[in-house]
Amino acid sequence: VGAAGRAGFAGSGQGNVTGMVRTAARHDRDAGGDPTLLAAKASLREMVWDRLAGGGVARFPGARNRISNFVGAEAAAERLRGTRAWRRAGTLKSNPDSPQWPVRQRALEDGKLVFMAVPRLAEPEPFFCLDPDRLTDPPRAASSIKGASRSARTVRIEDMAPVDLVVTGCVAVDPTGARLGKGGGFSDLEYALAWEAGLIGPETLVATTVHEVQVLEEDRIPMAGHDIRLDLIVTPDRVINCDGSRPAPGLRWEELTEEKIAAIPLLSALRPAGADRP
């Protein structure tokens, strides 16, 4: 996307991340779904968080209850940077978490347009638009959550450009492309929203950067029908190519809690008549 095209994006100007996080409902653990499946996922999260903490590879502020930052995140980002998927991508959509900060930084350094989710999708304009041609901070500072409030503007999903590569954070992954987030369902929601807006399609690749201790054996991670799968898993040491088979795209209103819908303005706006939970 060139500078002229980027200038056309509508937005509300600079955001206030501190205010967003302070006022956002704490709904990180209410993705909804089958209780047995949720319990199995929760058990795996605890196991991987123990690995990260016990192995001394979790960075501040620690492993638990988050997409954990890890020693080697920069090396993993650099390895992703060397992939064909990266070279072919002009526009990225990324999660806002710390372990993918080096990925966002390198994307801006390489002249890529980056859309970063506002924490918890808690604003009516739920994505930051980080344009490498219009930054007020250097790429490293601009690509942090705090820096995005100075260097980016928030945009509506209908004002975003088509995405070439999706970057998501994970607590755990396996070589088949199965992934496990922190339990809020945000990555799946972002994917479904972007699909319905026509920003991504069947050929859009999904990648993550993780530490080796987060890579589990095949078929260890239970998956729900709405869970997205990965095409690329990148660690500091290797690239794992996955099948990336996709679930049926779109929002599954029956699996969203009332708290989740109420806390995310875009979901409240999109909610169709008759989509009330029983």
Q: Language-model segments: which ranges?
A:
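Short hydrophobic beta-strand segments
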Residues: 86-95, 167
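A short, structured active-site edge motif that brings together acidic residues
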Residues: 118-123
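Extreme N-terminal basic, low-complexity initiation segments
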Residues: 2-7
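Extended, H/D-rich, highly charged conserved domains that either
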Residues: 94-108, 112-114
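Surface-exposed, charge/polar-rich loops and edge strands
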Residues: 9, 13-64, 82, 110-113, ...
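A short, well-structured juxtamembrane/interface segment
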Residues: 68-87, 99-102
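Short, contiguous, pocket-lining structural segments
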Residues: 36, 40, 68, 72, ...
